[in-house]
Amino acid sequence: MSRKNENDKSIDPNIGTLSGHLWEAANILRGPVDAADFKTYIFPLLFFKRLSDVYDEEYAVALEESGDDMEFAQFPENHRFQIPEGCHWKDVREKSANIGHALQKAMRCIEQANPDTLHGIFGDAQWTNKDRLSDALLKDLMEHFSRLSLGNEDCKADILGQAYEYLIKKFADLTNKKAGEFYTPRSVVALMVRILAPEAGETIYDPACGTGGMLLEALHYVKEHDGDDKLMLGKLYGQEKNLTTSSIARMNLFLHGAEDFHIERGDTLRLPAFYSGDSLATFDCVIANPPFSLEKWGEDVWINDPYGRTSYAAEDRLKRLLIRENFLQ
């Protein structure tokens, strides 16, 4: 499956060139696609390219170790994520017609091949809508991303993660979504995490995790203060109501090198996702920038909350108190 195109002229993916190059992808979409929807297409393409390039690196290592045994190099044990036959970036890049269909099929097949880790991660973008995404536009977009070498050897997780966060902020600025709905300023996140002061091995939960920035900052904090983030494997939990945003959060964590975390889509107040037996799960640390401006937040459900999260809140209190009680239970 791994095929190197010798005609590719990859750019050096340092943080400056990588961030700028990724942002240029938005200009390719500009016009047919609304600015608010840029992230719906650019983030999945970036993640698809990263998966494919890392797969190629793993394939090359296995090939060398096995004395050019191509069958061995494709064994699942040699790859963190599986890419089914015909679903690699290069397979889609070779298409000249119905590119959107090829992209959508490849992404869905990759999700199905990695059900425990990548289910639904590419979101619900309408890649086959040719009124919005013509073959010519998608071809330009594919070629633009193909100039990037996004394997671990050329693009370390911290560099790619910084570029990804740069895009998140740019998209938030572009659509004026700054008030916690999509993006919380990095300085605010850093301050909140310093106040929280999580320790290695503690579980950390963000019930309104957005794009995952607070969980990532908590992970960085633990690594900075304890020197090793391996004790945080399986310790990060988040829930996000918006489908696209929850997918972005998962991609964000993966691209930063996080190896084991739990991000679920759903309404934290109406349908909490994490349980311990018949009760809601509890966590060592809870951090969030909740959507306080939300109008229809589920008061009808909270009046008779089956988990007792309103036991300390009078019925006439504001949703701010109810959200707080959700954190404290």
Regions found by a protein language model. Give the residues of each.
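Mobile active-site "lid"/loop adjacent to the S-adenosyl-L-methionine
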Residues: F292-L328
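Hydrophobic alpha-helical scaffolding
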Residues: D8, D131, E153, A208, ...
